[in-house]
């Protein structure tokens, strides 16, 4: 990205452009996949989810690296679980992610009204209350499988979002998915531009989408409790909230295959300590509260516990 492009995206949001090179043969398989997702967008969810369940069980057997990471994470976070409990959660997780992925076309192209019918909220009053108090809003959103879908759905309910984003390595996928994320007015910001563009849009009234559970290493993090273990956690949420003059409201999206709906649970605004470690621990407590109820909805395949105090690689 050129310096001029960097300045542009810092002001207006990340905006990759279409290139005629995307029609070259090397991209044809991606276009074929996109066509398949578009077709699935109009298939009844029960039929689509049945297909996804079948595929997800196959993926669960084939994706050994991802399965290994999930197993390690669950062993550390839930040492009291039996091996059977961990295996069942992993199997359910792969089914859920496949259901969400096969439904991406629906999220990307169907109408506002359709997406509104396919979603429901609990705790929406916490957002309304913060607005009534004149506060900006930062949503604290752990890595659930339905995280992208919920961001787009919020737009359809008149709640514009802004978020930071790592551009996809494949430029065609990057262009397509950014277009889908922003089609109702959302703003994505490339992480290389820093946090300032994100904060500026929060101050202008967009709700910030903040992911609290990524591991950025020991130098940028503090070690605080996370389930039954500990985690390198970014400590700056209290400072970010202060700079944005925002309430920090935890939110967790789930996909319910029984109803075919995206269920978005919202908690009351957090009371954040001025102490960075206490604020970081409070974030992890919110994650624990959401995930414990439905562990298979969480993205356990991430290297969530990558940074350890003794420098060991638990995923090796």
What are these regions (language model features)?
Residues 35, 69, 125, 149, ...:
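Short Gly/charged-rich anion-binding patches and loops
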Residues 120, 189, 267:
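General small-molecule cofactor/ligand-binding pocket signal
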Residues 2-8, 14-17, 24, 88, ...:
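Non-catalytic C-terminal accessory region of glycerolipid acyltransferases
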Residues 2-141, 174-176, 185:
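Membrane-anchoring hydrophobic helices of lipid-metabolizing enzymes
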Residues 99, 133-192, 218-225, 229, ...:
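Catalytic core of membrane glycerolipid acyltransferases/transacylases, capturing the structured
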